[in-house]
């Protein structure tokens, strides 16, 4: 028999801190619940248990508190966000059939110990899942600890058996108790012996075997292992050491059920579990727990519905008229060998009244550009693509529920129709077995429209997000022409550069087998063999991340390693990556993502053209291979310092506004104000510092981050920041008010009314709260800039169409728009870009663009 025992409080704690704060649409925290259930699934897969017990601590004091008043006295209060989720975790575990174990006056650790001892007595295997290293003392031939850890921002489980404990700590599992009795434990406030730290404690136990062994040699002054001062402390604190041993020993006699079969997984209440998971918007977990076929229990807060009529299924009329709701049943994906393939394609359908019309491709085309039809759809992007591929525009599409869902909750990772129906509690007007979402479409869309109006986001939706979907579909359709032969030659050059750098690296390391892609080999070479400074140890060995290597760039080997990494990324990501996605027409048709970024910004993939490097000469050279077709040029318009101009507008700061209005260099002007210098005395270094502060303020950077950016001490950076805020008090006042308002209402807004919820601001955890404050500062500025460029895209696209020009908007990257224009239209296209981009808003500081043109993107930028 195999028993899995989970330390419920410990795993919940790991889950809470391992995942960023998640909330449901109505503001309930779910990150610990989501994380706990994910960890549970991993544990079940890893241990394959026959029985599962979940141990929880109770609030009442334990025998250890009675033994020592200071026990756990320094523990911080559990964050409210976690405390609210624990009862739900316990409820879900019960509904899924898992048995909870508690014992008044005892800790969860003792429950783990007692069940482990019971398994050992039966020669059964026991797996203890916990994030608490105290449980390692329980490891034995029959007991394995599955230790939940977090490293490099990722959670994982480390399997600790007897050999693993000995290898890591140099002592046996039981000797860990002796070690703790000497060094104490700050988290549990176990005192230990004054002056004995971790290193000394391990050394003493490794030498003498136990606490008793240490004291047996205490009077042997000829033994130099124990230093004189340590000997003195050991003698003085013997009672504390023995108390610490008792406090640190996990008991194995807790009054709980230890019988075989006591923790067999029961039936639970799967229907109620599914209902609760749906309520918590944990839809992905329903399938992972194998509950997809379970009908959820009725919502206790909603009155039982009358039996619903069945839908009528019909073929789409030859001449459809009126208003239809259009959506798709998602494609069914599955494994074919090791590949993920589409087992069943997405299937579109239309709803009118109580009639459902399955739609073939020709049916869709009869609806999408039909003057007698209007369509409310869910996910317009593929529909616009179909219409445009057939020579139309998708002009019948009047509203998109997916875009509405994004505006109403930008924090969601995806927008699934079935899940939204549950989240909005949309009522079905009829049932339809083949198209199960069809009956609730009308109520879902109505509720979304009502909510958008209530949140005053109608203008944002109607003027920006909805029309932008058509623009993006057209841009994807057109694509951008690339010089394939040029990219291939660039790739040959890259590979040659890579070989040259690798040869230098091998010469510098003295090893032809040295692999610069191996973090282990690189760390050992830099910090063990060469003894370079700034080394940081992680659980996996020496850190060799970009920040660590940048601090060592002055060393020739490190400079070559960084060069090697840069060339390698250029070659694999951009050269080889771009060559794979060139279509038959010689163009790259990147896909724009409208519903991903919480700030409202666009992203792109397949390929991601937002990240084409521009800071290095070789990186920027890639842009030369994005070209205009014969007889055309690329016209490139880029906003100049749009975020700083928005900052000047929203803060009302006269100094900042004046600098922009008079055409001064804003960073030079800022430096002059901060340092009290005439403009002509501002050095490049001071300007660079001011530039870093200007942007750092918006992104919520503190003195430490700023010091890294401008290469000064933290103290100097702190002085710069204080000087800046004193010089521009309205900026400081605006930031403070933004955070205060966000705390009060739970969100921030752009100037266009786009909302971003910030549950992080309510956290008791300082780091989480600080992250929320940074987002509160940044989102209104960055989000407004995103809204502005989206609006400009819509206006530019419409102008080019309305004026019947051949010029086409083909690409956007951050604050930049690119039009492919016939040479004869280039000047007019440039004028339209400038007029629409600068004229789409009326702010206290006018927006400014820089417009250039060329045969390729590098020339035009």
Annotate the PLM regions.
Residues 3-4, 8, 14-53, 69-70, ...:
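Conserved RNase H-like, two-metal-ion catalytic cores of nucleic-acid enzymes
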Residues 22-23, 73-256:
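Extended two-metal-dependent nuclease catalytic cores across DNA- and RNA-processing enzymes
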Residues 126-129, 136-174, 344-347, 352, ...:
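Charged catalytic and DNA/RNA-contacting regions of genome-maintenance
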Residues 237-359, 374, 434-437, 442-614, ...:
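Conserved "right-hand" nucleotidyltransferase catalytic core of DNA-directed polymerases
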Residues 353, 402-431, 438-441, 594-678:
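Function-dense linear segments that define catalytic or interfacial modules
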Residues 452-464, 468, 788, 792-813, ...:
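Active-site palm subdomain of RNA-directed nucleic acid polymerases
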Residues 477, 589-590, 594-597, 672-805, ...:
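Conserved catalytic core of nucleic-acid polymerases
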Residues 496-503, 507, 511-558, 726-774, ...:
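C-terminal polymerase-core module
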């Amino acid at each position: 028999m195999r028993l899995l025992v989970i330390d419920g409080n410990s795993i919940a704690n790991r889950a809470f801190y391992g995942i960023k704060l998640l909330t449901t649409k109505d503001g309930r925290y779910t990150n610990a619940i989501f994380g706990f259930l994910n960890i549970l699934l991993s544990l079940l897969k890893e241990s394959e248990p026959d029985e599962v017990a979940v141990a929880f601590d109770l609030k009442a004091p334990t025998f250890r508190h009675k033994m020592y008043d200071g026990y756990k006295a320094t523990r911080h209060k559990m964050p409210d966000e976690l405390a609210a989720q624990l009862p739900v975790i316990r409820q879900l575990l019960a509904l899924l059939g898992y048995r909870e174990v508690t014992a008044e006056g005892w800790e969860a650790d003792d429950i783990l110990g007692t069940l482990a001892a019971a398994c050992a007595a039966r020669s059964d295997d026991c797996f203890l899942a916990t994030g608490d290293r105290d449980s390692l003392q329980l490891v034995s031939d029959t007991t394995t600890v599955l230790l939940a850890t977090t490293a490099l921002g990722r959670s994982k489980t480390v399997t600790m058996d007897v050999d693993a404990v000995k290898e890591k700590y140099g002592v046996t599992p039981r000797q860990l108790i002796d070690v703790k009795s000497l060094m104490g434990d700050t988290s549990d406030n176990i005192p230990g012996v004054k002056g004995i730290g971790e290193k000394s404690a391990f050394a003493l136990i490794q030498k003498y075997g136990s606490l008793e062994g240490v004291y047996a040699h205490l009077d042997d002054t000829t033994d130099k292992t124990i230093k004189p001062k340590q000997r003195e402390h050991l003698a003085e604190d013997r009672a504390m050491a023995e108390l610490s041993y008792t406090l640190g020993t996990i008991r194995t006699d807790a009054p709980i059920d230890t019988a075989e079969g006591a923790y067999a997984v029961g039936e639970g209440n799967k229907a109620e579990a599914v209902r609760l998971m749906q309520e918590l918007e944990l839809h992905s977990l329903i399938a992972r727990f194998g509950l997809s076929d379970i009908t959820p229990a009725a919502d206790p807060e909603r009155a039982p519905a009358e039996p619903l009529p069945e839908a009528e299924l019909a073929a789409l009329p030859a001449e459809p008229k009126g208003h239809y709701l259009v959506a798709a049943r998602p494609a069914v994906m599955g494994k074919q060998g090791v590949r993920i393939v589409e087992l069943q394609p997405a299937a579109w359908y239309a709803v009118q009244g109580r009639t459902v019309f399955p739609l073939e491709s020709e049916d869709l085309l009869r609806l999408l550009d039909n003057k007698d039809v209007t369509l409310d759809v869910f996910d317009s992007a593929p529909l616009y693509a179909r219409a445009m591929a057939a020579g139309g525009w998708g002009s019948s599409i009047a509203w998109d529920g997916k875009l509405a869902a994004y505006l109403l909750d930008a924090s969601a990772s995806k927008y699934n129709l079935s899940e939204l129906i549950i989240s909005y509690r949309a009522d079905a007007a009829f049932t339809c077995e083949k198209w199960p979402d069809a009956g609730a479409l009308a109520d879902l869309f109505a509720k979304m429209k009502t909510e958008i109006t209530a949140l005053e986001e109608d203008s944002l939706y109607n003027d920006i997000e909805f029309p932008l979907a058509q623009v993006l579909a057209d841009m994807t359709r057109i694509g951008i022409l690339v010089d394939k032969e040029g990219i291939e030659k660039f790739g040959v050059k890259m590979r040659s550069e890579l070989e040259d750098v690798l040869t230098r690296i091998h010469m510098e390391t003295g090893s032809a087998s040295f692999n610069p892609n191996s973090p282990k080999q690189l760390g050992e070479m830099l910090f063990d063999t060469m003894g370079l400074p700034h080394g940081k140890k992680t659980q996996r060995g020496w850190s060799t991340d970009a920040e660590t290597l940048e601090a060592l760039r002055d060393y020739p080997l490190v400079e070559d390693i960084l060069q090697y990494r840069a060339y390698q990324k250029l070659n694999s990501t951009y050269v080889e990556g771009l060559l794979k996605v060139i279509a038959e027409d010689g163009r790259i048709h990147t896909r724009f993502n409208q519903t991903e970024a919480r700030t409202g910004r666009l992203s792109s993939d397949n390929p991601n053209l937002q990240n084409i490097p521009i800071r290095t000469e070789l990186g920027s050279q890639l842009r030369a291979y994005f070209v205009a077709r014969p007889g055309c040029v690329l016209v490139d318009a880029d906003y100049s310092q749009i975020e700083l101009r928005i900052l000047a507008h929203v803060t009302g700061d006269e100094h900042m506004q004046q600098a922009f209005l008079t055409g001064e260099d804003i960073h030079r002007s800022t430096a002059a104000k901060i340092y009290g210098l005439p403009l002509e005395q501002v050095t490049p270094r001071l300007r660079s510092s001011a530039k870093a502060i200007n942007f750092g303020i918006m992104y919520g950077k503190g003195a430490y981050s700023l010091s890294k950016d401008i290469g000064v001490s933290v103290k100097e950076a702190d002085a710069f920041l204080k000087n800046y805020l004193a010089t521009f008090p309205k900026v400081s006042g605006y930031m403070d008010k933004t955070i205060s308002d966000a705390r009060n209402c739970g969100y921030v807004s752009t100037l266009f009314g786009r909302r971003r919820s910030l549950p992080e601001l309510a956290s008791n955890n300082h780091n989480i709260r600080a992250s929320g404050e940074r987002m509160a500062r940044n989102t209104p500025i960055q989000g407004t800039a995103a809204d502005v460029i989206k609006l400009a895209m819509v206006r530019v696209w419409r102008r080019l169409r309305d004026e019947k020009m051949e010029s086409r908007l083909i690409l956007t990257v951050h604050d930049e728009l690119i039009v492919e224009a016939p040479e004869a239209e280039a000047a007019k296209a440039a004028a339209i870009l400038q007029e629409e981009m600068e004229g789409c808003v009326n702010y206290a500081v006018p927006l400014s663009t820089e417009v250039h043109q060329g045969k390729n993107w590098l020339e035009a930028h």
